[in-house]
Every structure is written in C-alpha cells, then in structure tokens.
From Swiss-Prot:
Protein name, UniProt field: MFS siderochrome iron transporter D
Predominant location category: membrane
GO molecular function, one term: transmembrane transporter activity
Function per UniProt: Major facilitator transporter involved in fusarinine C (FsC) uptake. In contrast to TAFC-mediated iron uptake, FsC-mediated iron uptake via mirD does not play a significant role during infection.
Similarity comment: Belongs to the major facilitator superfamily.
Amino acid sequence: MLSSWQKKFFQTPEHPPAEGIAPPRDDGVPNPEPVTYPDTKYPSDVVNHDAGEMLPNEEAQDGVTQAEAITLTWSKISLGAAYFLMWLLYLVNGFQASITGNLSAYVTSGFESHSLIPVISIVSSVMSAATYMPLAKVLNLWDRSIGFIIMVAFATLGLILSATCHDIGTYCAAQVFYSIGFAGIIFSVDVITADTSTLRDRGLAYAFTSSPYIITAFGGPAAAEHFYDSNWRWAYGCFSIVLPVVALPMFCLLRWNRHKAKKSGLLKDKADSGRTWMESIRHYIIEFDILGVFFLAAGLVLFLLPFSIAGSTEDDWKSASIITMLVIGFVCLLVFALVERFVAPVPFLPWALLASRTVLGACMLDVCYQIAYYCWFNYYTSYLQVVYGTSITTAGYITSIFDVVSGVWLFIVGFLIKKTNRFRWLLFIAVPLYILGVGLMIYFRKPSWSVGYMIMCQIFIAFAGGTMIICQQVAVLAASDHDHAASSLAFLNVFGTMGSAVGSSISGAIWTHTLPGALQRLLPDSVKADWQTIYDSLEEQLSYERGTLIRQAIALAYASTQSKMLIAGTAIMALSLVWMFVIRDIKLTKTQTKGVLF
C-alpha cells in the first residue's frame, strides 16, 4: 500500500549513482565528467556542473538563469552592496517586528479584543503560507526583483492600513497584507542569498543577513514603549516610509546588473510566448494554481479559527457558526486535496520534493518547531507584564533574547558547518536542548519564581532554535539543485508557517477555554462580576497594583494558562526527536551557483 501511494504522489524513487568517480577540483580547472563523492549515495549529491563554465544555465527557469547571469556579471563591490542592502532589509524587518509585536497586545486591547491575538496570527500565518509557492514561481518564472518589489508593495500597504485603522476588522485585514509582505520580502532575500553564496558558506551568509536582529532586540522594545506613550499609529506609519526607501536600492541594484548581463550577451531576450491577454491570464491562473491557493487558505482559516474563538461564543462548541466553520473548513481542505490530485495541471506544492527524506525531515522538523513555539509565544509578553510586573521595554528585551543570542550563535553555527561540511550533527544537540528549555519553563512559570529563570530558559531556546532554523534551510538547499532552490525554500516556509498557524490555534484554544474559568475561580468576590472586562484588556489587568489580591489572582490565572500552553508545546516538540533522524547527513561539497559569490 505504501509503495502504491508513493507511485501516485511522487515521481521516481531515489537510485544510487555510480561510485568511484573523482571529486571535483576547487582550483577552477574543469572536470571532464560528472562527479560524485565517495560518501554520497543519492542523486542530490551528484555534481553535474562543469566547474569552469562561465555561462548561465539556459535550460533552467528564467528567474534562475537571470540570477546566474547577474552573479556572473557583477563585481565584488556589487556583491558587497547587495549583502549590505539585504542586511538593511533584515534590520527594518527586525525593528518593525519587535516594535509592533510589543504593541499588538495594546492595539487589540484598545479595540477591546485582546483575546483575538491568536485569531489575527492564524489568519496572517495561513495567508502567508498560501503565498510562498506562488511567490517562488514568480521568482523562478519571471525575475527575483519582480517578486521582491511586489512583496514590498504588500508590506507598505499593510503598514499604511495599520496606521490608519479604527476598528479591529480593518486592523486584521492590515495585518494580513503586512504579514504577507514582510514574509515575502524575507523569503525573497533568502532566495537571493542562496543565489549569491556557495553551499558551504550558505550558513554564514544567512547568519550575516539575519544578524541585525542583535541590534533590533535592544532598540525595538524601547522604541515600542516610546510609541505607546506617544502614538502607536506612528509605529506603523514610520515604517511605511522607511521600507520603500530601503527596498528600492536593492531593486535597482538587481535590475541594473540584469541590464549589464543582457548588454554583455550573457542574458538573452525571452522569446515571445505568442499568447493573447486572455490566454496569458488563463496560463498564469493555472501556473500559480489560484484554485488550490483559495481552497487551502479558506480551509485552514475556517478549520483553525473555531479552536480560538469557540470559548468566547455564547454556546461554545454548540454554536451553529462554530460548527459551520469547522464543516466548511474541512470540506475546503478535502476539495483542495482532490483538486491537487486530480484537477490541477500544476499543483500548489511540488509534492515530488517529499520523495527526498531530507526535505521531508526538515519540513516536519520545522512544523513541530513552529507549533511548539507558537503554542506559548503569542501571549508571552502579556504574561511577563502581568505575572512579573515588567515594563513593555523589559518584556520586549526578554522576548528578544532569542534574537540576540541566536544572532551571535549563528555565526558560530555557520563556521562549524563550513569547517565540517556537515550540518545534521548540530541537530542532535539543538533538538534536545530546545525541549529542555521549553520543559523548564513549565516548572518556572509560577509567580513565586524569579524572572531570571525564564531568561535562562530563553537562552537555551535561543541556542537551540537558531541552530535548527539554519540547519533546516541548509538541509533543503543541499537536497536540491539551484533550479529548485526557491521551490525548496518555499516548501519549507509553507510547512513552517502552517505550523505557526496550528500553534496559534492551540494557544488561542487554551487561552479562551482556560483563562476565563481561572479568573472566575480565583478573583475576589468584589470583582468577580468584572472578569470579562479584565479578560478582554491587558491595560485593565495591569491597572491593579502588584501585591493586591486581585493582581495575584490574575497572575495565578495567567500562570495556570501558560502552563497548559507550555505542556502542549513540549509534547509536540518531542516528535522532532524522530524527524532529525530522517534527515540525511549530506556532505556540503556540491557546486550549485556560479560567478562572484559570498
């Protein structure tokens, strides 16, 4: 039965190549024949490139051909400028994520919708997940710069809408545009990083581009408190100005070097397709699998949202609207599966990638990691402020420990990958350490413990989480060639983002089904009737002085709720102990890219 399932969904099984062929030279002298390495067993490890070839691969997809032409054309100065601009883009993303992340609880509380944080996260995550594969196709079929600038437009629109919204509905819509845009920008930058680096140095390249998070971890929370004291709308408004200013030079750099490549003859004009406008529209609807994207996004949103909002409805799970959403969501997911299997000429996901156990293992590891993380993270800043009495700035610093520690640690991880030409051994350390960090948070979550123990757990999580993220990216890229690099990264991001949506759904379900009951049980009789007001607003919760019976009751209710979230996250993360063994121990000596590289 398993073999028949594989034949249906996967193209061909992996067959070992011939062995005994000499490894490629690294001195620029071409090898006369394709090469494999003594310890490789699978086709993904076969090197079919001529090491001395200085022409872009005309048989690759247009976006890949253009990327190779650019790296063969540009100078070291252009390479340095590209990495500096990508570093700036990560800096902008880090600042806006840190600032708006610390303000989101107050923005939603201002609309009396604090409990809707997971709902917004679920919708944003699902829509982002549905965007990755179409974006990868834009990057592959058209141009890296085109996909990048489209995502900049989405992010800018989301920021403008967030700055001008006056109700929770508009804010939710703004967050969807904003999340799609910034997720797409970072994905585009990661693909460009893969285009412009060797496989051995890719870990270091990703460490460099993501290093701005070290800076934003300190500046973001303090800026968030300043915006909260003055006007939170400018937290979004200022970035709607800054983002285009930083992004346009990157777009211009790519377009200019593309122009140089065409002028030098490395890049040829694309032949006219001969399609009419209507034929082109139909072609791209099929190519981007718009039908599949619609059913996937609708199915996930409708199926996951009830878990977060059922507890806040009058009839709970008996509510007709909740039952309807679950049924329609399940039907949409079923239709998505049937459409992908029997109807779609170009499926939403390149399922054949899962024939590689490395891609499968990395994707499932990322799913477990994201679910486990978002099981407890969405309400973590609120938890720190209520239970430990931290300010917005201090809570932001604690949640930013991951960015600081992992930002520095990733350089060491990248160096270790470069020196050993291996990455899997790092997972054997990182996965157990992550489980330990989350597990210890269960024990230290109570108000009676010092916040220092929570900081210790965050440091463990930062070391482990940063290592897992970089190893997952290197794994899927090592298991594919340059032509499929964007698709492989998109595949990983789709799984990870859907995992974050599931984690947010679990978090919301625990919150709405645990915290109200805990408040009604623990609050003094004098304020029991006000439990709904307290539940809906973080500002209301913080208005009670620390040490009072009311504040202590709220803190204990938070601790009880956080405990269930952490237990769920730890249990799910334990599955990663299996997935890390599924990933193959690939030696990172393949030649994938050409030209002037990182």
